[in-house]
Swiss-Prot record:
The keyword Secreted applies. This is D-(-)-3-hydroxybutyrate oligomer hydrolase. HAMAP family: 3HBOH (MF_01906). Its EC number is 3.1.1.22. Residues 1-33 form the signal peptide. It is found in: Secreted. Keywords: Hydrolase, Secreted, Signal. The active site is at residue 311. Pathway: Lipid metabolism; butanoate metabolism. It comes from Burkholderia mallei (strain SAVP1). The keyword Protein transport does not apply. It comes from the Bacteria. It catalyses: (3R)-hydroxybutanoate dimer + H2O = 2 (R)-3-hydroxybutanoate + H(+). Pfam families: 3HBOH (PF10605).
Length: 699
């Protein structure tokens, strides 16, 4: 590893990592200087590492297609103190598998995977990709932002035909979070890939020990790491000690507890990732101007750059394109974007010619409502037969559903004299709030898997700029007894492999979401018979009563849907129950048509039987009913590439009517092209009409 010196801020942990490396001179400045200057937002030193494509590589960390597909995750020589390289390997393994279906019957190795080329053929063997990585922090000078930036430059990069693909992390994942969603396609295309962790990035602080993570996942104490930690809780050591005494075994997380509302910067940091990639490419391919330093070969706009990712990484790409004032981004391709749109009067979302009940709500609204109602709605007749996605016994889950319905009814929040009617009313309220009937069978697994509770709690903390010591709505993050769910000291600290195995949003990697009641903290599902209704209701009231500044902070993350006439594609699954299409993609497309009018170059592809988590597609009941949206994300990237490079027209907005695999849950037949109709130039009756602020999606 080579370290390129940037700024002067460097903590002991980083200093140790630099020992034995070669320090090359570089300076901060702007791209108009003769010498390639490190962007001013880069803090500390840049780590440069070359990978040979055999023992280690950019895409698979040396595991290859076979290793990524194996259920045996990579281990550590010393489990108590894994190396940075071992943590990187585990991070790539975990994040790749978290975003796609990794089963052969589900499409891995046939439609996607390291062995599959861009034409969809199995020609690449193990798919290892040689190249170079550049790793650094972006910061504002405070030492508290510390957004992780990473650029991968494959050995196949053609400096005469340069390209960049952004791969902003989805969820609150670490910097490798979108390696399967966008990084893989970019690397295979021979493009540099510009990653960033959005300033959420799986950073945690173990309150009881003071242990924090560094940029490479290795650990240090908060005091020794100083401003080089990925995240350190802002409270004083005495405040944290008092909190630990009252609430032991708790954890602070960066997205939830940084008090910075990081989402407001997601577009900006995605642009910074592109600028950092320009610097890296100039450093690698620019002319040598004084014997040691490189000049500038590429200036803003010189490199074909596609902003891409999924979920809130996709939302970040859209925000970046809107904020781009220097020509960094050429085009946008995103999947299932989590995006909060600033809707203007007159904009309308219709389906089958009729207005939908609700659209364009921000995540803070629909997530807190769903978290409150989903456990009850899961008991509705329309949700019968939903996939079961919980480690709890079915009897416990059924009891939770019954009790949540009863408590909601007692509070006057649902109507009905029995569980069935109460559940039906809860589901009807979700319909009225913009959820589609296509999502009926996903309401239960979105809550049972704890995806919705995790999002509701993390984002509520972020949008209220809460501290870990606030225990917002009596929720916190803690290790628990695996049998009782009560807060308990871990046998082994989850911090050791957090960088490699965590996803940044508890419950994750042994750190769980707990509700702090009179008897102490307990897994929120088990803390009360109604699964911590009081906490869920409190989260909902934050939004409905506009408490703790939540409205102001949500307004700060809204976007205008002005892509500045850049060509763009949005792909979204119609059945998505985590990021409902009415509130995200449909709303964005409608607002974009009002904002950009006929100058808009945005195409929208809505995938029937598509939902948010392709990694769930191997679960019984998911496999038979839902198809991989990732397949269409990659098709969209190919379409955009052909548009940019050969002028091929982008297919118009359309509904893609897929065919579920069917069969027996858990044993669905292999995915085939019969399940996955192509995106077409002439969609006919499947065309989505978009005009002057109105989108009408065929039934």
């Amino acid at each position: 590893m080579t370290a390129i010196r940037g700024g002067s801020r460097r903590a002991p942990g980083l200093a140790l990592a630099l020992l034995g490396g070669v320090l090359l001179g570089a300076c901060h400045g702007d791209e108009n200087a003769q010498v390639n200057a490190l962007p001013g937002f880069v803090s500390g030193s840049v780590r440069k590492t070359a990978y040979d494509g055999a023992s280690d590589d950019l895409l698979t960390a040396g595991l290859g297609k076979t290793g990524l597909g194996s259920d045996t995750r990579p281990g550590f020589a010393n489990p108590a103190q894994p190396s940075a390289a071992e943590l990187r390997c585990l991070a790539i393994y975990s994040n790749y598998r978290a975003l796609v279906d990794i089963t052969p019957n589900g499409g891995y190795g046939r439609f996607w995977g390291p062995n599959v080329d861009l034409a969809g053929n199995d020609t690449l063997g193990e798919g290892k990709i040689a190249g170079t990585e550049y790793l650094a922090y972006s910061d504002d000078g405070s030492g508290r932002k510390n957004v992780t930036l990473l650029v991968q430059v494959p050995a196949s990069f053609d400096p005469a035909n340069p390209c960049i693909v952004t791969a902003t992390a989805s969820g609150s994942r670490g910097v490798y979070g979108a390696i399967a969603a966008a990084g893989e396609w970019g690397l295979k295309r021979g493009c540099a890939v510009a990653y960033n962790d959005k300033g959420g990035g799986n950073g945690a602080h173990e309150i009881g020990t003071g242990v924090v993570t560094l940029i490479d996942g290795t650990l240090a104490t908060a005091s020794s790491a100083g401003s080089s930690s990925l995240f350190t809780a802002s409270e004083s050591s005495s405040t944290l000690a008092a909190f630990n005494s009252a609430f032991p075994n708790r954890y602070a997380y960066k997205h939830a507890h940084s008090q910075q509302n990081p989402e407001q910067d997601w577009g900006r940091v995605t642009l910074q990732a592109v600028e950092f990639a320009y610097w890296a490419l100039n450093e690698q391919f620019g002319p040598v101007v004084d014997g040691t330093r490189h000049g500038i070969r590429y200036r803003p706009g010189d490199i074909t750059t596609i902003a891409a990712s999924v979920s809130n990484g996709g939302g970040s790409a859209l925000a970046a394109a809107e904020q781009d004032t220097r020509g960094w981004i050429t085009a946008v391709v995103v999947g299932e974007p989590q995006i909060n749109v600033r809707m203007t009067p007159g904009v309308t979302v219709e389906q089958g010619g009729a207005p939908v009940p609700s659209f364009g709500r921000p995540l803070a609204d629909y997530a807190t409502l769903a978290n409150l109602l989903q456990p009850c709605a899961a008991a509705a007749v329309a949700a019968t037969g939903a996939p079961y996605l919980s480690a709890l016994p079915m009897g416990v889950t059924q009891s939770i559903r019954t009790q949540r319905c009863a408590t909601l009814a007692a509070a006057g929040l649902v109507s009905g004299a029995d569980t069935a009617s109460q559940a039906s009313d809860a589901l009807a309220q979700l319909y009225a709030a913009g959820y589609l009937a296509d999502s009926d069978l996903l309401q239960a697994p979105m809550w049972d898997s704890q995806a919705m509770p995790a999002i509701a709690v993390t984002y509520a903390n972020a949008y209220t700029r809460s501290r870990v010591t606030d225990n917002l709505c009596n929720f916190s993050f803690a290790t628990t007894n695996p049998v009782t769910g009560a807060v308990a000291a871990p046998a082994v600290s989850p911090m050791t492999n957090l960088f490699g195995a965590g996803n940044g949003v508890p419950p994750t990697n042994g750190i769980n979401l707990v509700f702090n009641g009179a008897s102490g903290g307990v897994d929120h599902r088990l803390a009360t018979p109604d699964a911590s209704f009081a906490g869920a209701f409190c989260l909902r009231q934050l939004w409905t009563a506009n408490q703790l500044g939540i409205g102001t902070n949500v307004d700060a993350v809204r976007v205008a849907a002005n892509l500045q006439h850049k060509p763009a594609i949005i792909v979204h699954g119609r059945s998505d129950a985590l990021v409902p299409v009415n509130h995200a993609s449909r709303a964005y497309v409608a607002q974009n048509s009002a904002t950009e009018g006929r100058a808009s170059q945005l195409s929208f592809y809505e995938v029937t039987n598509g939902q948010h988590f392709d990694a769930f597609l191997s679960v019984p009941g998911f496999d038979t009913r839902f198809v991989p949206v990732h397949y269409y994300d990659e098709q969209a990237l190919n379409l955009m590439w052909n548009h940019l490079k050969s002028g091929a027209p982008l297919p118009p907005s359309q509904v893609i009517r897929t065919v579920p695999r069917g069969g027996v849950p858990g044993a669905a037949p292999a995915l085939s092209t019969a399940n996955l109709p192509p995106i077409v130039q002439s969609p006919g009756a499947n065309a989505i009409a978009v005009n002057a602020g109105v989108i009408d999606v065929p039934l």
